């Protein structure tokens, strides 16, 4: 296997959904680190205070993962990384040809938060309240792998499920983005939900009702990739809880997406669980990706 790719996780300021008395964003950081390093393809470091981070640190890495929301509560405005860090990250991808990964809620960006619009251009999409940002009703979600396949999704199930995840819909795709995974955002699930929207995650319902929400009854992107200048970006909005991390489809897809963002290529095959290897612990790679 090639020399390990150096991955940097930017984390540390999350909403109470991901940092409270029962769970911590550090669990996400640990799961991501374990999943990536167990492939044998990555060496991961985590920074919990990325505001003001400059190119002298960022440029040492091959790929940067964002696990950062910049606010304490859903109702609050986010405070971003700051100008120096924004400029360093944009150059890191666009000019230096490196990669970025936007994980789960970090993909959401409102116009009045102070993040540069260029991050949306990098991601190849916008996920915000005006575009229809909302969580689907809680429960099991059915995911579809988009055809034709990209090497990131080669060999994973055409249809699979996650349970207990925050399924964020309302993505406005930009030209050039390639969708990897979708879910059908069906009206029936909303109408049959015991409570929706939840009080901690308000949604402005149009006068015409839930059916008039943007993107209702359409396939909604949950993972996509985009070329940005000389570099690449991988965005994935699932991953709220450990159940998703245990799905073999996620175990195969996520490290490949990170590898593609870093290099533009996919070499990881996914864990082999045949024979005696079936006894290996999660995430099953044993550094033999």
Task: Label the model's feature ranges.
Residues 2-4, 31, 189, 198-289:
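Extracellular ligand-binding/catalytic regions of CAZymes and related secreted enzymes
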Residues 13-16, 50-52, 70-73, 106-110, ...:
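Solvent-exposed loop/turn segments at secondary-structure junctions
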Residues 1-61, 266, 272-288:
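Aromatic-Pro/Gly-enriched surface loop or interdomain linker
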Residues 102-199, 270-289:
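An acidic, glycine-rich "communication" segment
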Residues 9, 58-112, 230:
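Short alpha-beta junction capping motif
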Residues 19, 105, 136-140, 157, ...:
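Active-site rim elements
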Residues 47-53, 87, 217-223:
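Alpha-helical scaffolding within the catalytic cores
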Residues 16-26, 74-81, 113-115:
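Short, flexible/disordered intra-domain loops and linkers
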């Amino acid at each position: 296997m090639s020399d390990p790719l150096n991955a940097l996780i930017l984390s540390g300021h999350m909403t109470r959904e991901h940092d409270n008395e029962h769970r911590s964003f550090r669990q996400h950081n640990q799961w991501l680190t374990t999943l990536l390093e167990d492939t044998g393809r990555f060496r991961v470091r985590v920074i919990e205070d990325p505001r003001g981070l400059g190119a002298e640190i960022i440029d040492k890495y091959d790929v940067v993962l964002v696990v950062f929301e910049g606010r304490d509560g859903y109702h609050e405005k986010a405070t971003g990384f700051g100008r120096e860090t924004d400029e360093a990250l944009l150059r890191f991808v666009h000019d230096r040809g490196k990669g970025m990964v936007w994980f789960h809620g970090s993909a959401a960006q409102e116009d009045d938060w102070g993040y540069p619009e260029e991050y949306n251009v990098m991601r190849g999409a916008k996920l915000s309240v005006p575009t229809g940002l909302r969580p689907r009703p809680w429960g099991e979600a059915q995911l579809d792998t988009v055809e034709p396949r990209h090497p990131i999704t080669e060999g994973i199930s055409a249809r699979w499920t996650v349970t207990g995840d925050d399924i964020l819909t309302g993505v406005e795709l930009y030209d050039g983005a390639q969708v990897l995974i979708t879910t059908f955002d069906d009206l029936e699930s909303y109408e049959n939900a015991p409570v929706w929207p939840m009080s901690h995650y308000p949604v402005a319902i149009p006068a015409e009702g839930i059916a008039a929400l943007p993107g209702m009854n359409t396939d909604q992107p949950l993972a996509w990739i985009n070329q940005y200048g000389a570099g690449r970006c991988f965005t994935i909005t699932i991953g709220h809880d450990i159940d998703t991390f245990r799905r073999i489809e996620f175990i195969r897809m996520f490290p490949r997406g990170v590898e593609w963002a870093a290099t533009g290529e996919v070499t990881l095959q996914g864990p082999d669980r045949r024979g005696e290897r079936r006894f290996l612990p999660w995430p099953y790679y044993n550094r033999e990706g």
